[in-house]
């Protein structure tokens, strides 16, 4: 390996889902700062416009898309090739959380919505990405997002969400084995407590304080802390890492 400050990222093309959210936006900004062209994807068109305005360099593009539209995945990824000149990285950050006070409040709709977005759409998008990367013959990086809930089982009524994130870990391992021979790595990032609207939503101040008190480093992560892990996994420095879930939790989760 030849060492470089850019770690092989300048000139690459990344598709970032959930790009209008707190973590996804930071991932997109970090990629652009590293010389990567970004196709930012989210259901929030106004949020995408804001994120696109923050990206340096380029070219960049955005698309408002509900990833539950599985038949759009191939076209979406092909757009990165056609408009930005390639497809090297999928940073799949998109996810939803419906937190209920207890199990009895969980509805079938809660279950279906979270599994459709967090797990079903993730599998089919990962598969579409792996196929396109394999066909292009230049390898690639797929980076999924799990959660500390995959290990802990969730908190604050988020058991269904945790179940989907456990599925992400298993799926990531299986796809890593599937695509390894094609020089495509598949990994996941597992956040702990990150200061985002998703984390704060549905929690009382007391519950939030209790959660932060369990973090050995004593504070919540910022979205940029997660973006750093994504850039590492997308870089040449991580070329021999696959099937791994990187825990970014300030010591909250240790395994």
PLM region spans:
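Active-site loop of short-chain dehydrogenase/reductase
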Residues: 12, 86-87, 133-147, 181-184, ...
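Canonical Rossmann dinucleotide-binding motif of NAD(H)/NADP(H)-dependent dehydrogenases/reductases
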Residues: 7-39
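Short C-terminal tail/terminal secondary-structure segment
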Residues: 1-6, 97-100, 231, 242-255
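Substrate-binding pocket helix/loop in short-chain dehydrogenase/reductase
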Residues: 101-103, 107-115, 211
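Alpha-helical segment proximal to the catalytic Tyr-Lys
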Residues: 131, 177-181, 239
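Conserved glycine-rich Rossmann-like NAD(P)H-binding loop of the short-chain dehydrogenase/reductase
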Residues: 34-50
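Active-site helix of classical SDR
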Residues: 126, 164, 172
